[in-house]
């Protein structure tokens, strides 16, 4: 009953005096009482807890350390410091003393004992090489001293432990100002640890440090790959015209892929610059084609079409690949003329572009848009992939006309890509009557049955029917 009463008082407002009286009388195990002190943040119990620590077992120690970390003061500092040091600042679940010591320091900062806590944290920086402990100590110093802690942040950047360096940069974000940015930029100019430079560049990018964009751009030309890529990535995050021009220029470099990624996630508008890049040197043009396509830049459509006839093979290849991202329904006429003249490797790219061109339209409208070109074509199979995407009954009928006519394999290749439940019966009939395509038809048949809205009984019947004609073990399984 005493433990129930203690727990109740711990969660009852205005019960501090009553709880303290029960603690003094030790009406329950010390471990439970210490837990209640922590919940209640009962500062007046600190002397009692410190006295109990002298002969406490491990579970009670853990409860007391926890309570002191929450409601303790500088009076508890020496005790927890010694205990944490004895534990070699390890995370020991039995007592949790290291975590409690670090939490006590933060509690002291909140309770106007920041100067004492900061001094203890500075001592801790020297006492251990554990990155996670030193990071927590640095956090205390920054919270206690604010911008006066900059020297400790800069010192952390000279440390050999990257985890600690990165953590120091992260912790500095609440006090970061132009003075800190300038000091970090000086480090970028030094010839010391290259990984430190990469860390700073990554941090500049994450925090959008516009004032240091020149320092970032300078490092884009670094001989060290990690530094160069970090600078390129940071420039994309920071944004701005200067960064944009530098990234466009990097499209013609060994780090073109990194520059492309940075531009795709660029912090700002880039379409006008990409349009200019489409008129630049070949390497930049090719990269710009990819960017224009990925960003679905319909303003680039004419330039992409013009580059389809470029005398440079790699530019033509990039232009055909880019088509799919820059076309819309109004471009189907041009695409039709293009595919009707094409007899080689570019047909799949043009077909993909045609599918994307009509994709924004409803299924019936897709069919209505493409069927005039099918009807007047000498090779209607060129349009089957577009009809398959539409997938409405009229499209299925049109493709089946080719399957039963002069375009059997071309039509079948599109039929198995139609996402329409009506294809279940069509594919079954093909599996029964077309030995060449039977297995592929059954594979698609079972896939459509599986994702259909049919009842379990109806699905069983459809599977059973397929098994009766299946000869492929994989289909049977």
What is each of the regions a protein language model found here?
Residues 4, 8-9, 14-17, 27-32, ...:
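Beta-propeller blade termini and top-face loops
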Residues 2-3, 30, 61, 94, ...:
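Residue-level detector of extended alpha-helical repeat arrays and alpha-solenoid scaffolds
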Residues 58, 62-63, 77-78, 94, ...:
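Interface amphipathic segments
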Residues 1, 26-28, 56-57, 88-90, ...:
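Short inter-helical turns and helix N-cap capping residues of alpha-solenoid HEAT/ARM repeat scaffolds
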Residues 83, 103, 338, 409, ...:
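Alpha-helical, heptad-rich or low-complexity scaffold/stalk segments
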Residues 5-9, 36-40, 67-70, 100-107, ...:
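Core register positions within helices of long alpha-helical scaffolds
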Residues 1, 12-24, 31, 42-54, ...:
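Amphipathic alpha-helical scaffolding segments comprising HEAT/armadillo-like alpha-solenoid repeats
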């Amino acid at each position: 009953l005493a433990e129930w009463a203690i727990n109740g008082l711990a969660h009852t407002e205005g019960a501090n005096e009553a709880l303290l009286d029960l603690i003094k009388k030790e009406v329950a195990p010390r471990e439970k009482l210490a837990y209640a002190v922590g919940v209640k943040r009962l500062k007046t119990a600190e002397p009692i807890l410190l006295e109990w620590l002298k002969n406490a077992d491990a579970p009670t120690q853990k409860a007391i350390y926890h309570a002191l970390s929450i409601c303790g003061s500088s009076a508890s500092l020496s005790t927890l410091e010694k205990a944490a040091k004895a534990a070699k600042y390890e995370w020991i679940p039995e007592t949790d003393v290291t975590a409690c010591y670090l939490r006590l320091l933060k509690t002291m900062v909140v309770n106007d004992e920041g100067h004492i806590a900061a001094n203890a944290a500075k001592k801790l920086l020297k006492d251990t090489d554990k990155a996670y402990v030193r990071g927590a100590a640095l956090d205390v110093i920054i919270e206690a001293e604010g911008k006066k802690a900059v020297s400790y942040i800069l010192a952390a950047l000279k440390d050999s432990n990257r985890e600690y360096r990165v953590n120091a940069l992260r912790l500095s974000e609440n006090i970061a100002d132009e003075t800190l940015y300038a000091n970090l930029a000086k480090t970028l100019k030094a010839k010391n640890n290259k990984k430190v430079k990469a860390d700073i560049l990554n941090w500049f990018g994450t925090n959008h440090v516009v004032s240091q964009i020149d320092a970032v751009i300078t490092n884009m030309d670094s001989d060290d790959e990690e530094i160069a890529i970090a600078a390129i990535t940071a420039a994309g995050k920071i944004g701005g015209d200067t960064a944009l021009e530098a990234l466009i220029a990097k499209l013609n470099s060994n780090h073109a892929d990194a520059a492309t990624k940075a531009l795709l996630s660029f912090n700002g508008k880039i379409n006008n610059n990409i349009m200019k890049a489409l008129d630049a040197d070949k390497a930049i043009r090719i990269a710009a084609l990819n960017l224009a396509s990925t960003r679905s830049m319909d303003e680039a459509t004419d330039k992409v079409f013009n580059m389809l006839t470029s005398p440079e093979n790699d530019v033509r290849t990039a232009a055909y690949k880019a088509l799919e991202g820059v076309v819309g329904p109004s471009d189907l006429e041009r695409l039709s003329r293009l595919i009707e003249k094409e007899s080689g490797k570019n047909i799949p790219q043009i077909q993909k572009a045609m599918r994307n061109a009509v994709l924004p339209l409803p299924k019936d409208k897709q069919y209505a848009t493409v069927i005039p070109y099918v009807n007047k074509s000498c090779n209607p199979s060129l349009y089957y992939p577009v009809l398959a995407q539409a997938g409405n009954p009229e499209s299925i009928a049109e493709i089946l006309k080719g399957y039963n006519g002069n375009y059997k394999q071309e039509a079948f290749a599109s039929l198995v890509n139609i996402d329409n439940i009506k294809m279940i019966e069509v594919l079954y009939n093909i599996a029964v009557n077309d030995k060449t395509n039977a297995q592929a038809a059954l594979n698609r048949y079972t896939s459509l049955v599986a994702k259909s809205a049919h009842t379990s009984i109806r699905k069983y019947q459809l599977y059973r029917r397929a098994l009766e004609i299946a000869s492929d073990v994989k289909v049977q399984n």
